[in-house]
Each structure stands twice: as structure tokens, then as C-alpha cells.
């Protein structure tokens, strides 16, 4: 980070959250001069809400960011104090790495990575206006009257645009607790005539870990064989800890129920829509009234920090009500609240106003990334920041833009969802959103995206060398597997039961029979067992899904062909048990007349379309039989 001494840059990034840090680093890796504006340098990389990175779908995004040499995965590996691979018992395609992080270590890691990045200048100051000329952005103006010129501007405002913090019936302006909102810039953006709306998110009260009865709680350790995020790392760097698990109860629920009218959300003080898949404790008790208890994870916020994050009870109830209901929870009877939970409401813009590069259609040179586009979550924000930063730098260099495809990355799925379908509620990533998820595994993100990074020039020499070594080993292993074949009798001798059909099967094809088959192949193919475990694991996953991926591609093509099929106006979605309640309500409200229209609904998934098609075809057959 250098002292601010120039007033012209190639790219200006506004905001130092997860999207802004990733955008600034990505653009600078492309060799352009970047200025990152933030209200406080000490706030760069702050984890404003939960102290965790990754998860289902989200962990895939972190791996993709890392594959393009982004910073989130490396910072999470440095700061991670508990690593868990979610969905470990399910197929590799939907397994998601997650790490609970030490807030201080994560923030310091991000700041250190930014400081080491050539071409990146971090500047403290509030951007209050955009310099525009001839329908293109030309730079920004600061609150102190300074003008800074730049050919491209990336806005990553998070929850700061007209942000309002709510605790019960109390409300005050704020971008997050302790920070002022961005109101002047919000007014300037309002003059662009872009479609905009209000969203909200929330956070739970922070607890004093010294007042928790830890000995009375169930403890959850991390994985014994932790899976880290960066392809450059092999193991966590920080000391690992366990988290506590407790539950709400009938007393908790009654206190919340009795005070619903005092909640900012249920008291009518908030107009913004909250995240469906991260509901407040008020939402849980209203929407899931039949549930007797809700799980709460007690996550220490750091190795040297007594603050505990109670994951699962975010709220906008008054502070005294929060204290009352929290103390009904087992293990928290004497707990002290260090900071009350709160809801925050903020402006966002319809992402359909953006090109797939995340450039604003109505104003050339201006890019949006993160929560300003209607997403929720650190990982979704960081991934958008990466895409915006790379594309802004490519544009400055007058090179072809980078378009991430749905078939090649979760990043491509997210950007396509946002720019083609828009959002009416905070968007978060799930593996179910990707029609090609069998080939978009977390473990092969480098094989999918690092070659793109090499072509762009955004990947370090160290990563290039590491990637090339891994690719050579994968090619060697694949050749060994494809070059070896077995008769049914030989496979039976190895402990793999197949029909005696006389067909020889390559060792790669045998991988489709699962883990035991992969172990047997390691014994039966000369030289294969000498390959590193990581390489053999990835090849086993490639083989496991090979046939399914072909079927996946055929199903995606079939869906494309079936887009013209009509859906009756009175079609009943309620009996489709495979549809989420979210999609049922959206389908019944929108009443799409064709499969193509249904496909454009926000939150629609390929599996949901397949269910609708199957029901339509069954109805057609039944009608023909009458």
C-alpha cells in the first residue's frame, strides 16, 4: 500500500470489502494501475457478518477464485481455525469446503496480500461522485473535493448505499455497525435511472465466550483430514479448534413470538427483502412454527478473541428482548451480550442492467460487483469482484472481454443468473443452480479455470509452475488408466464384481464403480499407485462421473429443445414434491406459459425444469389414453 501521490489510475475500485479487495487485486495482476478507495485502511478484508468462508456452492466459488490467483482462498487458509468438508457423505460434485476463520488473522492476511501486489494503491477517502463525459465514466470525486481520473471504475458498495441499521424500533444510518453509510454516492447513482430496490440482511448478537457454559454443550471438532481452499496449500496454518452446538427451545420461541411486533422486520420498519436461506430467528419461528428447536452453532471469532458468533439466531429484536431469549438457550443462561444483533437495509440495483462483464449498460466504464447486484455472502461478492476486476483491466488494454460460461464455472452460472434473470431477494449460490454441476467440482476448479488465467496473464509464476506439474501428473495418470484394461475375471479377482459379459474395461472406466474399485485399480495398474494421493483422488472422481457427464450434457441439450413446450394456465405445481416451496410460489405467481419462460424465473434450476417436463408429458399421455 503506497501513499496517495498520483491522481490518475487505469482502474478505480470503490469499497474495500470482499468484492472490492478481489477486484483491485485482479485488475492489478493484469498489469494496470489500480486505486482502491476505502473509508478506513484498517477495515480492508473485514468479515462483517459470520466468521466463515465457503460452504455448499460457496466453497466452489472460493476454489474458482483461487484458480485465477485470487486472494480469498489463500487468506482463508491462513486464518482458518476449523475446516470441514460439507456433504462429505454425498458425491464429490456437491461437496463444499468450509472454514471457520479467525477474524483478525483473515483481515491481516488480506491486507498483507494487497500490500504485496504491485500496481495497487490503497487510499483512505469517501467517493461521493462520478466524473462522466460523453456517456462514459472518467473518474471519481472525493468528499474532500479531490478528483481522481480513471478509465474504469468498479463500485463494490456492499450494504453502504443508503444503509440503515435496525434494532427493534430504533433505526440509524449505517453501512455496518460503527461505519457511516454512503448517501451522497447513492444519490448520484439514482440519477442514472437504473432500476433499483431495497434488500436487507441481518446478524446475530455477539456473545462473551467467557460467560458460556462450554462444558454443558456438545462440541463439534473440525475434520481430521482438513481440506483447504488454495491449490497452492496442503494444510491449515493456524491452530484448530472446536465449536459448540446448542438449540433453541419452547421458552426461546415464546419470547420471540410475544415480541414479534417489536422486531424491525415484523413491526413494519423494514421494506427490504431478506435472504431466504439465512432467516432470522423471527423468520424461523414464524415460517417453521411446527419446529420445537433450532440448532445454534457457537463459533469463536478468533484464537485470541473471547467473542463468540451464535450462528442461527440473527435478529432485529430490541436489545433487551435479545438478552431474554438468548439466556433461555442451554449453555447461554448467564451469557453476556457484547453487541446486539441487528438488521441492515440497503440499496441494490437490478443486475439485468449489467452486461455479462458486470459493466453497467447505461454508463460505459462503470462496473458493479457484490451486494450492489443483489447477492448475499462473502464468496458471491468476491467472485463478482474478480470478474469485474479482470474485465475492467481487459477493457483498458482493449482486449476481448472475459465471459464465464455456465458450463465451465459456478462464476458463470451466477453471473448469467444475475444478468439474465435478476433478483427479487438476496441471491446465494447453490450447487443445484448449475446444470453442469457434475463437471464443476471444487477439486477441479484449477483444471477448468487456471488455463484461462494463464492466457489472460493474471496468474503468478508460482501458480503456473504448480499447475503445470499437476497437469503433467494428471495426464500421466490418465494415460496409465486408459492404457490398462481388465477382463471380467481379472476384475473379480481384484474384488470388483462385474457381469461375466466378456468385455474388457479400461482402468479408467472401472473408476465408475466407486471408491473400492479405485483402490483396486491402484493395485492392478503398474506405476499408478506411485502417483500422489491428490492426483489419484481427482482421477477417481473424473472416472466416477465420466458417463454421468455425457448424460448431463444430453439432458441439458434436451431441455434446450423443449423450451417451446407450453404449460397450461391451470397447471398445478403443488403436487411436485421435488420442487422447493420457493419455486412453487414463484411459478404459481408468474404462471409461465412455456418451458422457456419458466427457465427465466429467478431461482429456477435444471432439475426443477425436468420435473415440470415430466409432469407435462405424463399429463399428455394420460389425456391421449382417454
Curated annotation (Swiss-Prot):
UniProt xrefs under PROSITE patterns: GIDA_1, GIDA_2
Chain sites annotated for binding NAD(+): 274-288
Keyword tRNA processing among record annotations: yes
The keyword tRNA processing is annotated on this UniProt entry: yes
GO biological process: tRNA methylation; tRNA wobble uridine modification
Compartmental location: Cytoplasm
Cofactor: FAD
A GO MF label: flavin adenine dinucleotide binding
Subunit structure: Homodimer. Heterotetramer of two MnmE and two MnmG subunits.
UniProt family annotation: Belongs to the MnmG family.
Name by which UniProt lists this protein: tRNA uridine 5-carboxymethylaminomethyl modification enzyme MnmG
Species per Swiss-Prot/TrEMBL record: Cereibacter sphaeroides (strain ATCC 17023 / DSM 158 / JCM 6121 / CCUG 31486 / LMG 2827 / NBRC 12203 / NCIMB 8253 / ATH 2.4.1.)
Lineage: Bacteria, Pseudomonadati, Pseudomonadota, Alphaproteobacteria, Rhodobacterales
Amino acid at each position: 500500500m503506497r501513499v496517495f501521490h498520483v491522481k490518475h489510475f487505469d482502474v478505480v475500485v470503490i469499497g474495500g470489502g470482499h468484492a472490492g479487495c478481489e477486484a483491485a487485486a485482479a485488475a492489478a495482476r493484469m498489469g494496470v494501475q489500480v486505486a482502491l478507495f476505502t473509508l478506513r485502511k484498517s477495515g480492508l478484508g473485514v468479515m462483517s457478518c459470520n466468521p466463515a468462508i465457503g460452504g455448499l456452492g460457496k466453497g466452489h466459488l472460493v476454489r474458482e477464485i483461487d484458480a485465477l490467483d485470487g486472494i480469498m482462498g489463500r487468506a482463508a487458509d491462513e486464518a482458518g481455525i476449523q475446516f470441514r468438508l460439507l456433504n462429505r457423505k454425498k458425491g464429490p460434485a456437491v461437496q463444499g469446503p468450509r472454514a471457520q476463520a479467525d477474524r483478525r488473522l483473515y483481515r491481516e492476511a488480506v491486507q498483507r496480500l494487497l500490500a504485496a501486489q504491485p500496481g495497487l494503491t490503497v487510499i483512505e477517502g469517501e467517493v461521493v461522485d462520478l466524473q462522466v463525459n460523453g456517456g462514459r465514466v472518467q473518474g471519481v470525486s472525493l468528499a474532500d473535493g479531490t478528483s481522481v481520473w480513471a478509465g474504469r471504475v468498479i463500485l463494490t458498495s456492499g450494504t453502504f448505499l443508503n444503509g440503515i441499521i435496525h434494532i427493534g424500533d430504533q433505526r440509524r444510518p449505517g453501512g455496518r455497525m460503527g461505519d457511516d453509510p454512503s448517501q451522497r454516492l447513492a444519490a448520484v447513482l439514482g440519477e442514472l435511472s437504473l432500476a433499483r430496490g431495497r434488500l436487507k440482511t441481518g446478524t446475530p448478537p455477539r456473545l462473551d465466550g467467557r460467560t458460556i457454559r462450554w462444558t454443558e454443550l456438545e462440541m463439534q471438532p473440525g475434520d481430521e483430514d482438513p481440506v483447504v481452499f488454495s491449490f497452492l496449500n496442503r494444510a491449515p496454518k493456524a491452530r484448530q479448534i472446536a465449536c459448540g452446538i446448542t438449540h433453541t427451545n419452547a421458552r426461546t420461541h415464546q419470547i420471540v413470538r410475544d415480541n414479534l411486533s417489536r422486531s424491525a422486520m415484523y413491526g413494519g420498519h423494514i421494506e427490504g427483502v431478506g435472504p431466504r436461506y439465512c432467516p432470522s430467528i423471527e423468520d424461523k419461528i414464524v415460517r417453521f412454527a411446527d419446529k420445537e428447536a433450532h440448532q445454534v452453532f457457537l463459533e469463536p471469532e478468533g484464537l485470541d478473541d473471547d467473542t463468540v458468533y451464535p450462528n442461527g439466531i440473527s435478529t432485529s429484536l430490541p436489545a433487551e428482548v435479545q438478552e431474554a431469549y438468548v439466556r433461555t438457550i442451554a449453555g447461554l443462561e448467564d451469557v453476556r451480550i457484547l453487541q446486539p444483533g441487528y438488521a441492515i437495509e440497503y440499496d441494490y440495483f437490478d443486475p439485468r442492467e449489467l452486461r455479462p462483464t458486470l459493466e453497467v449498460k447505461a454508463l460505459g466504464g462503470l462496473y458493479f460487483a457484490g451486494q450492489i447486484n443483489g447477492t448475499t455472502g462473502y464468496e458471491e461478492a468476491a467472485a463478482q469482484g474478480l470478474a469485474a476486476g479482470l474485465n475492467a483491466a481487459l477493457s483498458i488494454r482493449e482486449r476481448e472481454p472475459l465471459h464465464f460460461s455456465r458450463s465451465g464455472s459456478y462464476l458463470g452460472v451466477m453471473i448469467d443468473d444475475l444478468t439474465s434473470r435478476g433478483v427479487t431477494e438476496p441471491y446465494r449460490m447453490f450447487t443445484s443452480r448449475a446444470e453442469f454441476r457434475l463437471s464443476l467440482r471444487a477439486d477441479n476448479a484449477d483444471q477448468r479455470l487456471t488455463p484461462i488465467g494463464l492466457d489472460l496473464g493474471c496468474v503468478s509464476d508460482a501458480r503456473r509452475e504448480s499447475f503445470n506439474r499437476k497437469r503433467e501428473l494428471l495426464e500421466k495418470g490418465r494415460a496409465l488408466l486408459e492404457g490398462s484394461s481388465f477382463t471380467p475375471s481379472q476384475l473379480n479377482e481384484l474384488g470388483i464384481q462385474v457381469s461375466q459379459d466378456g468385455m474388457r474395461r479400461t482402468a479408467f472406466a472401472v473408476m465408475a464403480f466407486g471408491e473400492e474399485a479405485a483402490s483396486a485399480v491402484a493395485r492392478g495398474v503398474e506405476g499408478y499407485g506411485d502417483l500422489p494421493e491428490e492426483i489419484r483422488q481427482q482421477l477417481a472422481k473424473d472416472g466416477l462421473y465420466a458417463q454421468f457427464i455425457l448424460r448431463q450434457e444430453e439432458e441439458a441439450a434436451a431441455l434446450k429443445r423443449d423450451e417451446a413446450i407450453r404449460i397450461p394456465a391451470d397447471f398445478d405445481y403443488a403436487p411436485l414434491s421435488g420442487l422447493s416451496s420457493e419455486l412453487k410460489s414463484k411459478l404459481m405467481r408468474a404462471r409461465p406459459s412455456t418451458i422457456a419462460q419458466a427457465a427465466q424465473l429467478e431461482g429456477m434450476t435444471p432439475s426443477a425444469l425436468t420435473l415440470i417436463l415430466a409432469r407435462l408429458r405424463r399429463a399428455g399421455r394420460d389425456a391421449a389414453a382417454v
